[in-house]
Amino acid sequence: MVARAGGREAVTRFVRIAAWASAGDRVALLHVQPVTGRTHQIRVHLAYAHFPIVGDPVYGRRGDTSGLARQFLHAWRLTVRLPHAGERTFTAPLAADLVAYLETLGTPAARSPLLAEVM
């Protein structure tokens, strides 16, 4: 995907983990995998696809009312290749402020089995 003329190609894969619909607003928790590593790649691609990141002051919605003090971005699982240790995978549960935000949305209207892993 190239989001603007003259931009370099960047590839991002994303899958919906859960979705909420509250007060006319739609929110989705996504599993995102950047294939290329461009600056702001995830933020730009999700905004371009009409899924702006909650709390993003640049590419997000104006007048964000989430109450988050930061962007809803979380590195849940990272896999790296280390020269002497081979491939290693690290995971981290969703941060407490992000879990609290999701709880304010109520029960998801749709969810995948991956939701239990992420939370």
Show the residue positions of the predicted features.
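RNA pseudouridine synthases
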Residues: 1-119
